[in-house]
UniProtKB/Swiss-Prot annotation:
NCBIfam families: PGDH (TIGR01327). Keywords: Amino-acid biosynthesis, NAD, Oxidoreductase, Serine biosynthesis. One of its GO terms (biological process) is L-serine biosynthetic process. Its EC number is 1.1.1.95. Coiled coil: none annotated. The keyword NADP does not apply. Pathway: Amino-acid biosynthesis; L-serine biosynthesis; L-serine from 3-phospho-D-glycerate: step 1/3. NAD(+) binds at residues 149-150, 169, 229-231, 255, 278-281. This is D-3-phosphoglycerate dehydrogenase. The keyword Transcription does not apply.
Amino acid sequence: MVKILVTDPLHEDAIKILEEVGEVEVATGLTKEELLEKIKDADVLVVRSGTKVTRDVIEKAEKLKVIGRAGVGVDNIDVEAATEKGIIVVNAPDASSISVAELTMGLMLAAARNIPQATASLKRGEWDRKRFKGIELYGKTLGVIGLGRIGQQVVKRAKAFGMNIIGYDPYIPKEVAESMGVELVDDINELCKRADFITLHVPLTPKTRHIIGREQIALMKKNAIIVNCARGGLIDEKALYEALKEGKIRAAALDVFEEEPPKDNPLLTLDNVIGTPHQGASTEEAQKAAGTIVAEQIKKVLRGELAENVVNMPNIPQEKLGKLKPYMLLAEMLGNIVMQVLDGSVNRVELIYSGELAKEKTDLIKRAFLKGLLSPILLAGINLVNAPIIAKNRNINVVESSTSEEKYGNAIKITAESDKKKFSIVGAIINNKPVILEVDGYEVSFIPEGVLAIIKHIDRPGTIGRVCITLGDYGINIASMQVGRKEPGGESVMLLNLDHTVPEEVIEKIKEIPNIKDVAVINL
């Protein structure tokens, strides 16, 4: 009999599903020692965010086949350790989409009609009908930043209120946005100028941190209302505070903050700020969905079926996985680089295999590449199983081919194009490490780590030096560097490994240097 251990509170409907495939023991509030003891006999472990499934817990698991996370994030699970032991990790990335979208609309309405302030006034015994005059959503323009799962749910609900929708998402094709009834804009500043309401639904990355900053807030209408139910850090809270205090925009409604819980946050002293304590997924329905979705995923895995929400990888023979795994990691890295270099809606990608790879079944490599390609632009839920489906839904045309040319041995070449530019890169595994061998036709031999900068330039004396000086002026250390060129004085490419991420203002400074043609900074 399959033994299923549940160590965090789980909806009763999820328990019933699990009971169809095994003997369920619910043991919440376990100490670390108790968990280490109970995990020995478990075939399945189901957790939420409370249980920490660390490497030592996984190493104690003698029979464990599946770990189920009833929710999205897997920060509390050592996925690498699970993968090493062949344990499949599944989650429920779609469980909270509707709940977050509904909270977004709720906060939007509350801010527009001053509902929290009016409620507080009424409870103080006041009856002030003039002070809390609000505005309608009908006929207003809503700017949606990020048109993924949650953003799309917000669009549906906003349209029901009669709102006009404009969207900013450089990774969504125009025709996909149009099919949702969204006018796609190319520039976030244009969205900020035109929108009466602005809502954010993007992941927090070095690129999206303070995506709404002082410049964007200065462009907003005096009556603008901004809503954030995504991630703290997307908005420059200092700039937002100043604008709200000075009456430059109407209001803000926040479910997330840069520091949680917020300590002495001046935003919470303002009457035109309303908020909730990160309640996006805190609904009965979302909790039920998280439990039942992950329970169904566990059922599929136990029955030998392919589950859609596998976090680490499909259940494949270990011998095959051992051979392909280095190239899967290489492909994922190349995909990550390609998306961040193109920085736009990817239209077409070709994967070209050479050497022994040309004779292999490459489906897993393609899936790994797509996972890497999509990871920089999705909040959560991208994995080897669903990456091809998501790519197809985004109209990304993927072609695979092989070549008898063995210039680099077992190598993967990627050629890709967006609506803005084209890019190609070749990578291989050398001494068990992923190595970049070619960038846009320029030969190099470079091991990318941490933060990678790819800078195209004209090969002129002093150009590289000025780039290095600019980085140094901003306290950004260069760990390693290489230049690829075809001939002296012609177009060249420099690759740099950096110890720190590069702020947008530094990238702009580098672009201003004479002979610099293009700058791309990739966070690996």
